[in-house]
């Protein structure tokens, strides 16, 4: 029911008329020095793809690549991951470990969903409002951290968002969400582009409404831009038309490759404010309506104003 064809967040296999399995796998290298926090971020990042389809995680398997002389750190990584798996309501059912010079950790996750409730990533409708649930900028900040430039206050806020599960409340999932995806490696523009694939729709983004981590300007000015972010801009800027006068420092954040980034919802406009309220109650306190879905006949599909 979902797979490679439309760049979906996870694969979905229909069991019967009321049940389908959701499958995903993700692993990452460390973004922070603390192994326990790294484990939480990696697990939240892997679980996100199940939530992005509208599913519920059932069980997870650890995927570990780790140096054999750092087993104390590995224990903390696994404890961090287990914490998030438990928080998601899933079961940790085992895993597999390989010796590797560079640490890597992630999960293979199986979830469950009713086939009629699947939320695809490319089915928005004209007039839908777009809601983003987490601030952008974790890629830029992670690069600053690697270069020992990240300020503790900004890092603490980024860690809060990267470790927060993208679990939506049941009441919100009952609203008219027409399309849903999570913002990860391709950045906001890349994943929004996927949402606009195979249809005659575009999007209008209000750049000043898009939530971002505070204090990124100085890191951008210092050149702390990840290679993945620059690659995203190279690949997707051809799809973007922007209002004159938008600073390049502000624009690049829209292409920033995220880890455990937020969800992007395309929702019926009459229900957008209710969705925001429910998101706030779930702890997504920086959720914002960032734009809308529009009809386009030709040309660039994403307009930034």
Where are these regions (language model features)?
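Helix-biased detector of long, well-ordered alpha-helical tracts
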Residues: 1-305
